[in-house]
Every structure is written in C-alpha cells, then in structure tokens.
C-alpha cells in the first residue's frame, strides 16, 4: 500500500492526474483534477489510497490527509465504493456532509450521486460522531488566470460526469454558467454547491 507520492505533476485530464516519480508516471484518480492546474510541471505531494481489483490497480489521490480520511471513512460504509466516495469528497465544504451525518439528514445525503435512501441511512448509522473536525482546505493558492469560458466549462462538465453526476443535471448547470468566464476548477466548485442545494 502507498501512503503518499512526491513527484512532478505532468498531466491533468477530466478524470485523473499523472505524477512522475523515479521515471514512472502514476495515473491518480482525484475528485477535482483541475484543482491541480497551478501545479503542472511542479513538485507535488499527493496522499494516496490504492485499490486492487482483478482487472486493475487504481490509485485515488487527495490534497490532504484529512481529505483522505473522509474518503476512507466513506468507503467503509456498505454500498459506497471508491468512485462514489470520491464524488462525495469533491464537494468543497465537507462540513455539510459531517452535519448531515451527525443530524441524520437523509435528504441531504441523497443529493450525492448514487446515494439512495438505504445507503444514506447506513452512512448515518456507521459514521455518526466519527468525524472530529471537518477537513480544511490546505492550500492557499493564488487566483488562477481566467481562460476561455466555454472550453473550461466543457472540462468542468466532463469532470462532473466522471464523478457520477447525470447529464440531465449538468445541462442546467451548463445553461446557468453559459457566457461566463471562469476556470474549470471554479466551475466545478460552484456546480457542486448548486447540485447539493438541489
């Protein structure tokens, strides 16, 4: 098992990033790949969780140990796999998640992709009281230069699809942001907040 990787960030796609360490490029699935935009061709530390399946070995990556801890707690719940847990972690403010679990807010939990009533109830049962503190965003990144809005919006929608959100939900998001000019990361953060409000 791996705990973290230090290396040069060489590539960003809608689903994963690539970190080169000791001459090997590691494909790492992350919640919001575009949150790493400022780190391309720079040294990064990514906290890892490895999943070994019959047909694949997957690496899931996180900005901080706190974010990884939330992910690990989520995948311990019956009915939540790594992809679903990553989609939940992608929501910028995990305090909402912690409050929903501690207050048995099933409706809020059901807003996450692939979380039905039974799984939401299981989350409350298994995780209530297990989060000491909501994860803090570790980085103090400088504001990003704005790029072409439509291209960035396309990348954001592609990343949200990869997290499991439905195309029908994302049509409304796309229409809302059409004509604006933000980075893909900013679109993703704003879209996740909108999706969680319902």
Curated annotation (Swiss-Prot):
Residues 148-198 are annotated as: Domain III. CDD domains: UBA_RuvA_C (cd14332). It comes from Streptococcus equi subsp. zooepidemicus (strain H70). InterPro entries: DNA_helicase_Holl-junc_RuvA_I, Hlx-hairpin-Hlx_DNA-bd_motif, NA-bd_OB-fold, RuvA, RuvA_2-like, RuvA_C, RuvA_C_sf. Homotetramer. Forms an RuvA(8)-RuvB(12)-Holliday junction (HJ) complex. HJ DNA is sandwiched between 2 RuvA tetramers; dsDNA enters through RuvA and exits via RuvB. An RuvB hexamer assembles on each DNA strand where it exits the tetramer. Each RuvB hexamer is contacted by two RuvA subunits (via domain III) on 2 adjacent RuvB subunits; this complex drives branch migration. In the full resolvosome a probable DNA-RuvA(4)-RuvB(12)-RuvC(2) complex forms which resolves the HJ. Belongs to the RuvA family. Residues 143-147 are annotated as: Flexible linker. Has three domains with a flexible linker between the domains II and III and assumes an 'L' shape. Domain III is highly mobile and contacts RuvB. Keywords: Cytoplasm, DNA damage, DNA recombination, DNA repair, DNA-binding. Its main location: cytoplasm. This is Holliday junction branch migration complex subunit RuvA. It is found in: Cytoplasm. One of its GO terms (cellular component) is cytoplasm. GO terms for biological process: DNA recombination; DNA repair. Residues 1-63 are annotated as: Domain I. The RuvA-RuvB-RuvC complex processes Holliday junction (HJ) DNA during genetic recombination and DNA repair, while the RuvA-RuvB complex plays an important role in the rescue of blocked DNA replication forks via replication fork reversal (RFR). RuvA specifically binds to HJ cruciform DNA, conferring on it an open structure. The RuvB hexamer acts as an ATP-dependent pump, pulling dsDNA into and through the RuvAB complex. HJ branch migration allows RuvC to scan DNA until it finds its consensus sequence, where it cleaves and resolves the cruciform DNA. GO terms for molecular function: ATP binding; four-way junction DNA binding; four-way junction helicase activity. The gene is ruvA.
């Amino acid at each position: 098992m791996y705990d973290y990787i230090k290396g040069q960030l060489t590539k960003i796609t809608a689903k994963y990033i690539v970190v080169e360490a000791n001459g090997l490029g590691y494909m790492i699935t992350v919640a919001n790949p575009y949150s790493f935009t400022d780190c391309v061709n720079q040294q990064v530390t990514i906290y890892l969780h490895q999943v070994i399946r019959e047909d694949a070995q997957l690496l899931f990556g996180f900005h901080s140990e706190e974010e990884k801890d939330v992910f690990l707690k989520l995948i311990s719940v019956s009915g939540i796999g790594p992809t679903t847990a990553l989609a939940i972690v992608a929501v910028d403010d995990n305090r909402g998640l912690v409050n929903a679990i501690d207050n048995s807010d099933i409706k809020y939990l059901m807003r996450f992709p692939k979380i039905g009533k039974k799984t939401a109830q299981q989350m409350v049962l298994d995780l209530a009281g297990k989060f000491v503190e909501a994860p803090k965003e570790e980085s103090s990144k400088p504001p990003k230069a704005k790029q072409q809005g439509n291209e960035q919006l396309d990348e954001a929608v592609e990343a949200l699809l990869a997290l499991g959100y439905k195309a029908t939900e994302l049509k409304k998001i796309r229409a809302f942001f059409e004509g604006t000019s933000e980075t893909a990361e900013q679109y993703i953060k704003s879209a996740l907040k909108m999706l969680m409000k319902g």
